[in-house]
């Protein structure tokens, strides 16, 4: 049996692909707790970018807006329109929450697509986008669940729980199950899409470096933005649903 150098190279490439992993965690030990440090580091980085950009752009508001001020005013209008469409006339208090969710997820996703986190060497583990960790997406989903429970209870009081037996008490188990499936779908949709995008890029780079992965990276930027929009839209829709009491 003849094994050519080409076939050996092909087998080696396939072996390298088989070694692609989701990633290793970098931990901090604080007291008796083990903390995913890479999530905190990259999350702080994203938050610093957001706060720094806003402070620089709007610290001196101009009557004739600068380009940066125009951009952030456009982003604010977009978030307000999104909140009003999904929540209704009482959208005002929820604009900061929906905006925070959208901007944090958007910048986190783009940081994973644009920044070479992997080249930063750690004692163990590796850095990645915050939304590439299931802990982050679950936390965001649980915050959304807490928000729509608060919205419903603050408007309707204990009568909010009547929704579980409407239109018929037979649907009680299904209505309760729905409150568990909402955060699950939010968290796993975001985590799965971001993780899949990064893995596809890693595999393509290992096969054909530099040229072929570039269109996939641009596609990743597009889908990253779409995922942030989907999460924010669903969060606003759930809040509006809890306040209006319709399904």
UniProtKB/Swiss-Prot annotation:
The chain crosses the membrane at residues 38-58, 95-115, 134-154, 199-219, 220-240. The keyword Ribonucleoprotein does not apply. The keyword Transmembrane applies. Its main location: plastid. It is found in: Plastid, Chloroplast thylakoid membrane. It comes from the Eukaryota. It is a multi-pass membrane protein. GO terms for molecular function: proton-transporting ATP synthase activity, rotational mechanism. InterPro entries: ATP_syn_F0_a_bact/chloroplast, ATP_synth_F0_asu, ATP_synth_F0_asu_AS, F0_ATP_A_sf. GO terms for cellular component: chloroplast thylakoid membrane; plasma membrane; proton-transporting ATP synthase complex. Keywords: ATP synthesis, CF(0), Chloroplast, Hydrogen ion transport, Ion transport, Membrane, Plastid, Thylakoid, Transmembrane, Transmembrane helix, Transport. Belongs to the ATPase A chain family. NCBIfam families: ATP_synt_6_or_A. F-type ATPases have 2 components, CF(1) - the catalytic core - and CF(0) - the membrane proton channel. CF(1) has five subunits: alpha(3), beta(3), gamma(1), delta(1), epsilon(1). CF(0) has four main subunits: a, b, b' and c. Key component of the proton channel; it plays a direct role in the translocation of protons across the membrane. This is ATP synthase subunit a, chloroplastic. It comes from Sorghum bicolor. The lineage of its organism: Eukaryota, Viridiplantae, Streptophyta, Embryophyta, Tracheophyta. The gene is atpI.
